[in-house]
Structures are given as structure tokens and as C-alpha cells.
């Protein structure tokens, strides 16, 4: 079995993993012991990367659920017609704002542009995306705080800081590798600002339980 070292692609922490490959298939995943980022540890998401190898063939025709809950193939013409009729009926009954779309960061730019064009100009609906709720906010925050749009700090700072503040973040669950580095700093005061009493809030020195939705301002 061949061992190949590579970087986990599931978050920006960039942990290093050892992939054990046989006959072109990943059979086992384990964290790289001496890598400086994750230091021999990784989260359950990285450990299960071998489960993401199933290739799903793209469908050539749409599927429509019948009255019994079974999926049947229909033509593209019927698919577009059915979608348009159903969406129009919903908007006529409940108003234009009853329908919205949210996009992902995992589709090509051209597809994203088409989705936005159809949504705004034809369906007259609101849309949002993963980008604005995720990295776009980080980019603006970094630029306003440090003068450029990338984080200037390193993981070592978590082990050396006097005070660490988490705002709406739950690294105990979302980024356990980073949280492990934080816990190595036994003298730091940890403050969590979050309307939820999250796992990170429970493990903090101070939990500031602000009003729900106030963290979106």
C-alpha cells in the first residue's frame, strides 16, 4: 500500500494527511505525525476523506417525483415547464419574497452568474451565497483591522496570546485542530461572544451571551 502525503481540502487550516492508496483508491487516512500545522492530529472530517471517492454520474435528464413519491425521468422541456409553473404559483400565492436562493462556493463562476441572472431578472427574487456569509466577511475584517485581506497571524499566536476572543465561532466542534492549539496556552483568558451556549462558550473563561441575531450586525 502506497503512502501519499497531501493537504486536507475541507477548510483553510490546511492540515497534512497521510493517504494510504491501493489500486488507485484511498483505503485509509491518518494525520501526518510531524507536520507543524496539525501536529499529528486532525478532525473527523479529514479522517473520512476516503469516504468521498464515490463517483456520481451526472444525470442527462431531470427527475420528477410522482404522487407515490417515486422519481421518474422527464424531458428537459417538461422539467423547465413544471419548475416555472410551480414557482410562479408559489409567488402568486405568497408574494415574490416567498422565494429566495442561496448559492455555494463549489460551482463555476459561469453557473453562478447564470443563477443570479435568472433569479434577479426573471424570477425577481433575492439571493445570497456562501461567499458573503463566509470568506467575504473575513476579507473585509482583515483589511479593516490589519490593512490587507489575509490573516497576518499564525497558529503559534494561539499558544502565545494573553487573551483570545471568539465571536460567533465554535472551534471546539468546527476546528478542533485549532482548538487544540488554543488549549496548549494554559495562561490565556478565553472569551466567547455568542448568543448560543456553544461547546466553545462552555470551555471559555468568559461567555458573553448577547441577544440572538445581534452577532449578525
Which residues make up each language-model segment?
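N-terminal export/assembly segments and adjacent metallocofactor-ligating motifs
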Residues: 1-215
